Amino acid sequence: MNISNPNGNRKAVVIFSGGQDSTTCLLQAIRDYGPNNVEAVTFQYGQRHAIELQKAQWIAQDLGVKQTLIDTSVIKTITTNAMMSDAQIKQDENGMPNTFVDGRNALFLLYAAIYAKGQGITDIITGVCETDFSGYPDCRNVFIKSMNVTLNLAMDYQFNIRTPLMYLTKAQTWQLADELGALDYVRQYTHTCYLGVEGGCGTCPSCLLREKGLKQYLAQKSAVEKSSVLTAKEA
């Protein structure tokens, strides 16, 4: 991978789960900041499947990135949802998926900010996205912007929360991984499945969105390649 660092000696903390989105963000951060200027924070919040943490640990080690595991499992004692129990995945009467964990991204950003300030780091990167909106209110840009202001005021520190995937579709996120030279890496090593199935169950909302985006991107890529071949033949 060709490493450059347009950010000078600045460093970044990536909120990292081992999934497609956060791994793509981590790879982009390594490119943009340099591998020695990137750290990952991973949260143990009581998620129902250990495979998420295992994947995150393996990827961080493989990429040579320092990873810090933060235990926020206390949240499991004060809220319930399908991400932290064996409940069947469904939506409520308002269309909110029961995979939504109340306060999770707010909590993650708070702890990531506390950690970042302790390391003298201002840039925090998270892979939230509102384009393929899952119904999660804490994935919206308005929330991230407000949280950035709140954290700056709360700690008297100039955090810069970056959301490189905010306005990308899932297909565009796959495209970004490909541009980073890591399409196969993300396909093979990341975990997205809500049911904790190695390689994905293929039926949960997360797997369906991931596969739909991948198929869309590969179809677009194939069309571009065919067009390029035809153009070359005509030249």
Curated annotation (Swiss-Prot):
The keyword Nucleotide-binding applies. Binds 1 zinc ion per subunit. Zn(2+) binds at C193, C201, C204, C207. GO terms for biological process: queuosine biosynthetic process. It comes from the Bacteria. Its cofactor is Zn(2+). It catalyses: 7-carboxy-7-deazaguanine + NH4(+) + ATP = 7-cyano-7-deazaguanine + ADP + phosphate + H2O + H(+). ATP binds at F16, S17, G18, G19, Q20, D21, S22, T23, T24, C25, L26. Its EC number is 6.3.4.20. Pathway: Purine metabolism; 7-cyano-7-deazaguanine biosynthesis. One of its GO terms (molecular function) is ATP binding. Disulfide bonds: none annotated. InterPro entries: QueC, Rossmann-like_a/b/a_fold. Keywords: ATP-binding, Ligase, Metal-binding, Nucleotide-binding, Queuosine biosynthesis, Zinc. The keyword Zinc applies. Coiled coil: none annotated. SUPFAM superfamilies: Adenine nucleotide alpha hydrolases-like. PANTHER family: 7-CYANO-7-DEAZAGUANINE SYNTHASE. Belongs to the QueC family. Catalyzes the ATP-dependent conversion of 7-carboxy-7-deazaguanine (CDG) to 7-cyano-7-deazaguanine (preQ(0)). This is 7-cyano-7-deazaguanine synthase. It comes from Actinobacillus succinogenes (strain ATCC 55618 / DSM 22257 / CCUG 43843 / 130Z). The gene is queC.
